[in-house]
Amino acid sequence: MKVRTSVKKLCRNCKIVRRYNVVRVICKSEPKHKQRQG
């Protein structure tokens, strides 16, 4: 998982999710695209 100041969708399967006040990107097709804002 990458930790970034700004998270972006990297492909069309990426989804932006907000959990416990933390913005995350989850991606089923490409697990490398997982990101967390921090």
UniProtKB/Swiss-Prot annotation:
<dbReference type="GO" id="GO:1990904">
    <property type="term" value="C:ribonucleoprotein complex"/>
</dbReference>
<dbReference type="InterPro" id="IPR000473">
    <property type="entry name" value="Ribosomal_bL36"/>
</dbReference>
<dbReference type="InterPro" id="IPR035977">
    <property type="entry name" value="Ribosomal_bL36_sp"/>
</dbReference>
<dbReference type="GO" id="GO:0005737">
    <property type="term" value="C:cytoplasm"/>
</dbReference>
<dbReference type="GO" id="GO:0005840">
    <property type="term" value="C:ribosome"/>
</dbReference>
<dbReference type="GO" id="GO:0003735">
    <property type="term" value="F:structural constituent of ribosome"/>
</dbReference>
<comment type="similarity">
    <text>Belongs to the bacterial ribosomal protein bL36 family.</text>
</comment>
<dbReference type="GO" id="GO:0006412">
    <property type="term" value="P:translation"/>
</dbReference>
<dbReference type="Pfam" id="PF00444">
    <property type="entry name" value="Ribosomal_L36"/>
</dbReference>
<keyword id="KW-0687">Ribonucleoprotein</keyword>
<protein>
    <recommendedName>
        <fullName>Large ribosomal subunit protein bL36</fullName>
    </recommendedName>
</protein>
<keyword id="KW-0689">Ribosomal protein</keyword>
